[in-house]
């Protein structure tokens, strides 16, 4: 989209943060209004993360106005809220390409801009990285400042508290800004509290605070009295005692939509020594009423008409795999009161909304705490219950030791419903489900299933749920199912594949939902087609049968080739000294960038045409 200077006259003056800092303070509220309108205009045309960015407009302007970015280093946690940051840092005219193939990255990305200090996408990493960056800056000796912005969801994760505990110990000069849009303590936001925050962040209070401690530090009772008195005075109006105990100087909560007030407070805090903590209150979706009323729905949006206030409804076609899972979960829970379902803050995405409403006492959203989610499931299994952990492939990576140490070693019957496996599309490198088969396949006692359609997905969930000899996993992709008939649930024989088509010379061993593409290739090449179904245990007898009756084998999976299902087939053949040629088709050895699922599959030769061309070239 072309930039309309007449519509955004103040924003037109800002092509960099240096130009932003030349603006008079009085013009900044107008800049915020234009920035918010431009965000609405651009994201509604292109799609993308939306409500979070609307809530951080004033904070973004204030941070870049007060701090000398990019020399001073600004770190955004997760990055959903960083669209205004991208607009103000030289990427305004490209914001319409965000999340598209070849366009701006959906999150802050080091390779895209010098303003993006840390590449992000997963949550709760900012403070840990910020401490390292602050320590490096201190050793550099150039008075470079470090700021981390983290949301109220991300700060609940253990990694964030581990980092804050460390910061309190080594005391680097850094600022952590908590962007709190839950409104849980909104009654504390007002003129009095904003005034208090500016007072507490000012030089006079800081000098008195530190000076008083030095004077009386030799008198233990008085030192303790001063400490407790300060806590009680601040505790009457602020909820920051926890952060103070971790070693931070806590300021807030303050109004995160008062850009001039934020600038005053940030200027006061900029040169304070040691770890500082600023708590701001914002409203997700600020300035666009539909998003304010329903920030979850407007968190990430398709293209839509902003004048209507409504997002386009789905076409009502085939159900998503997430819905298939959610329906199975409800169906099973209605028959078995031992079922317990766990999600790390992904209720909507994992298809668990209906379950959470029907079975609230058996639904556990543990927040952004993947490690805890898995070990919590282990505890439920020890207690005789049947836990189902619904988790995205990319987020299960964060709980790998818990899967291994707390579940698999103890042979606990935990079912992992792994959503967003394979190529996920627009969120790019940080969110592709490229590695789960590789990192799970090497774990003893793990059963791993890859459905080729929605009916098989249901049967595998049922099979895993009733498998009591250890953990099991069913991995399925983002997107819609293929439209096959759903049959009554029954347990599948563990480790057994099925031949879908008999051909000559070539056998294609398919793992998962690339089956429709593999079927087209098999038909074109008159190849045998096998639905392997299980990655672990592999159907070794079927693999050896295919090797004995065909001149060559091809394995197909939407997972990294290295260590994936195809590697397992290779291992079986080598162990039995079968020298049959094997072509492994899957995800290559690099991080898959953003683009639609269709675009990326075509680029990576994972569509039917690409697979057939690759096989023909290999056979030639």
Swiss-Prot record:
Q: Does the keyword Ligase apply?
A: no
Enzyme class, spelled out: transferase
**What is one term from the GO cellular component aspect held by the record?**
cytosol
CDD domains assigned to the protein according to its UniProt record, in alphabetical order = TPP_DXS, TPP_PYR_DXS_TK_like
How does the record describe its quaternary structure? Homodimer.
Function, as annotated: Catalyzes the acyloin condensation reaction between C atoms 2 and 3 of pyruvate and glyceraldehyde 3-phosphate to yield 1-deoxy-D-xylulose-5-phosphate (DXP).
NCBIfam families, A to Z: dxs (TIGR00204), PRK05444.2-2 (NF003933)
What protein family is recorded? Answer: Belongs to the transketolase family. DXPS subfamily.
Protein name, per record: 1-deoxy-D-xylulose-5-phosphate synthase
Q: Which organism is it from?
A: Escherichia coli O17:K52:H18 (strain UMN026 / ExPEC)
Q: What is the lineage of its organism?
A: Bacteria, Pseudomonadati, Pseudomonadota, Gammaproteobacteria, Enterobacterales
């Amino acid at each position: 989209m072309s930039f309309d200077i007449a519509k955004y006259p103040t924003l037109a003056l800002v092509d960099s943060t240096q130009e932003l800092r030349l603006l008079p303070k009085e013009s900044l509220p107008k800049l915020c209004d234009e920035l918010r309108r431009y965000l609405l205009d651009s994201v509604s045309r292109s799609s993308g993360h939306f409500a979070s960015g609307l809530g951080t407009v004033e904070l973004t302007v204030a941070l870049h106005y007060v701090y000398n970015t990019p020399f001073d280093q600004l770190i955004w946690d997760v990055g959903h809220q960083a669209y205004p940051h991208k607009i103000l840092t030289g990427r305004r005219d490209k914001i319409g390409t965000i999340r598209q193939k070849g366009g701006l990255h959906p999150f802050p990305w080091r390779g895209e801009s010098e303003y993006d200090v840390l590449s992000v996408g997963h949550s709760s990493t900012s403070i840990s990285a910020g401490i390292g960056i602050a320590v490096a800056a201190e050793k550099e000796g150039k008075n470079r400042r470090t700021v981390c912005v983290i949301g109220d969801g991300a700060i609940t994760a253990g990694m964030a508290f581990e980092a804050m505990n460390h910061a309190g110990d080594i005391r680097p000069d850094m600022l952590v800004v908590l962007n709190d849009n839950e409104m849980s303590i909104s009654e504390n936001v007002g003129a009095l509290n904003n005034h208090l925050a500016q007072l507490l962040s000012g030089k006079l209070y800081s000098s008195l605070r530190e000076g008083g401690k030095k004077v009386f530090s030799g008198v233990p009772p008085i030192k303790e009295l001063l400490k407790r008195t300060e806590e009680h005075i601040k505790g009457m109006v602020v909820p920051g005692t926890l952060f103070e105990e971790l070693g931070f100087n806590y300021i807030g909560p303050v109004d995160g939509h008062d850009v001039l007030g934020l600038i005053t407070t940030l200027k006061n805090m900029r040169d304070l020594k040691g770890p500082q903590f600023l708590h701001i209150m914002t409203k997700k979706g600020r300035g666009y009423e539909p998003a304010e009323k329903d920030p979850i729905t407007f968190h990430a949006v398709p293209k839509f008409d902003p004048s209507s206030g409504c997002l386009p409804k789905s076409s009502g076609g085939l159900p998503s795999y997430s819905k298939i899972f959610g329906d199975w979960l409800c169906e099973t829970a209605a028959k078995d009161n031992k079922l317990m379902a766990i999600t790390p803050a992904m209720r909507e995405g994992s298809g668990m909304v209906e379950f959470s409403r029907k079975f609230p006492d058996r639904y556990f959203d543990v927040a952004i705490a993947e490690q805890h989610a898995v070990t919590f499931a282990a505890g439920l299994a020890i207690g005789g219950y049947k836990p189902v952990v619904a988790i995205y492939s990319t987020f299960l990576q964060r709980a790998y030791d818990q899967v291994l140490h707390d579940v698999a070693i103890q042979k606990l019957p935990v079912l992992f419903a792994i959503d967003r496996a394979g190529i996920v599309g627009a969120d790019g490198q940080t969110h592709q489900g490229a590695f789960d088969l590789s990192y799970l396949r090497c774990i003893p006692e793990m059963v791993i299933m890859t459905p080729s359609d929605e009916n098989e997905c249901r049967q595998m969930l049922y099979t895993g749920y009733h498998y009591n000899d250890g953990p099991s996993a069913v991995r399925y992709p983002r997107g819609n199912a293929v439209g096959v008939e759903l049959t009554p649930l029954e347990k599948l024989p563990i480790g057994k594949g099925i031949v879908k088509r008999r051909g000559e010379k070539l056998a294609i061993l398919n793992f998962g939902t690339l089956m429709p593409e593999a079927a087209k290739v098999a038909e074109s090449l008159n190849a045998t087609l096998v639905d392997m179904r299980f990655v672990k245990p592999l159907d070794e007898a079927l693999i050896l049968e295919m090797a004995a009756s065909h001149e060559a084998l091809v394995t197909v999976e939407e997972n990294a080739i290295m260590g994936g299902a195809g590697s397992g087939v290779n291992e079986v053949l080598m162990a039995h000294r079968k020298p049959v040629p094997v072509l492994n088709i899957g995800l290559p050895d690099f991080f898959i960038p953003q683009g639609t699922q269709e675009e990326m599959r075509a680029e990576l030769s994972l569509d039917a045409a690409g697979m057939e061309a690759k096989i023909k070239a290999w056979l030639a």
